UniProtKB/Swiss-Prot annotation:
Localisation: Peroxisome
Motif Microbody targeting signal positions after renumbering to this chain: 546-548
pH dependence comment: Optimum pH is 7.7.
Record GO cellular component, one term: peroxisome
Regulation of this protein's activity per its record: Inhibited by ATP analogs and sodium deoxycholate. Activated by choline-containing phospholipids.
Organism name: Luciola mingrelica
Listed EC numbers: 1.13.12.7
Entry similarity comment: Belongs to the ATP-dependent AMP-binding enzyme family.
Disulfide pairings: none
Cofactor(s), by name: Mg(2+)
Catalytic activity: firefly D-luciferin + ATP + O2 = firefly oxyluciferin + hnu + AMP + CO2 + diphosphate
Assembly, per entry: Homodimer.
Alphabetical UniProt keywords: ATP-binding, Luminescence, Magnesium, Metal-binding, Monooxygenase, Nucleotide-binding, Oxidoreductase, Peroxisome, Photoprotein
Name by which UniProt lists this protein: Luciferin 4-monooxygenase
Amino acid sequence: MEMEKEENVVYGPLPFYPIEEGSAGIQLHKYMHQYAKLGAIAFSNALTGVDISYQEYFDITCRLAEAMKNFGMKPEEHIALCSENCEEFFIPVLAGLYIGVAVAPTNEIYTLRELNHSLGIAQPTIVFSSRKGLPKVLEVQKTVTCIKKIVILDSKVNFGGHDCMETFIKKHVELGFQPSSFVPIDVKNRKQHVALLMNSSGSTGLPKGVRITHEGAVTRFSHAKDPIYGNQVSPGTAILTVVPFHHGFGMFTTLGYFACGYRVVMLTKFDEELFLRTLQDYKCTSVILVPTLFAILNKSELIDKFDLSNLTEIASGGAPLAKEVGEAVARRFNLPGVRQGYGLTETTSAFIITPEGDDKPGASGKVVPLFKVKVIDLDTKKTLGVNRRGEICVKGPSLMLGYSNNPEATRETIDEEGWLHTGDIGYYDEDEHFFIVDRLKSLIKYKGYQVPPAELESVLLQHPNIFDAGVAGVPDPDAGELPGAVVVMEKGKTMTEKEIVDYVNSQVVNHKRLRGGVRFVDEVPKGLTGKIDAKVIREILKKPQAKM
């Protein structure tokens, strides 16, 4: 009997593929073995030309899983990564999931303070570190004393007195071990067993440890293969990614690619010409980007020099993408639109995605299978209807189990009825397309009015002389906050602060005017996924304008 649907709650459809049995590790092990038999390539590093086949990935992940098991790792323990993007990144991720240990990914660019905080939460037994990350990991090990072993991730030989992966495997795997004989461990309760310990965005302070379950991960595999999003199990299909793997966005999209047998083509850094050449040479059908890169591509003079006829999709995620920028880039690549999605680390990536052939300009998409979403009034907390702006709340099988060792923050995020409060402002229309307006905590409070920075950023980006822009509130004793902007000008273009202020003020109502002024910068402060850093912008706006 079908459950009665709640009023003003938007439900996703039934999944095209049923959720498969077994842990995330069991399912990934099966996928790896399945695509290995087909001879498909799993990973390609476009910068170095290195390819790793599914067979090679299957063999080394099974060998590493066996080594960790023999080292003494138990399902309740954790391992961590500290590395930039590299072709080896997902080897310990998969191996850890095979044996039921939780995996905590971090990046070598973390400051010592951030890494100490993250690994202090994770409490890993083993840390897989890149050579770049090793000095910081060694420093952190002095205080995070649970770290028993450091293994070098991106080296074929031992480095800095520490075992590389191959040495670690040889020490802990019996001679003659056959990867095909390895059997992954199932977990007792995948709804409660932690698969990954991700870092929250840290937009309100140091990151929190987000506990993602095996249930959440396997639900994502179902979405990754769902043809409603233009996906299909198609071994060998090349997908280009420049998204950070340690971030939830990069982690879960890549694991989803493995579920489909795709060839993940990786660029460790963004270079405009190399990016376009990679799309051409690898015949990539899809590319996934953070919004920061859309502004660069929108102004690119190189696109027409490459054969990009295989490209059928550009996807955006990790941060809001301005409608006008997305539309402009789609036109440059002769595509009908940009596939958008919306989600959080706490929801195991996107719970709103644009279905194939059902996109709307400015919309993030529709609710995915097995999820339901509502919009609540910011003051009364009552559920709102169509075209009413409020906070977006979500329920579904991929919600985090909670924040690690932080019950207070968990209670603030997930209410007693199980709804996760995203902290984002948005609405849905008559066709159940969702539109994300802004971050609740980013709203500028001017004389009792709420001003969304994203709206002002969109206005600024529409000016032909402005390359990029970010908006934040400047503290004011009388008004509370004044909307202000930092602006990057197009090469060879100039405008005065007054010209920019007058332009914006002519486009918006009185309370949204740029009373906090404008600062000219070389680069808008943003995080790794392209999210604008309002805290840094606020500090820039507090300072007097430097003379040009």
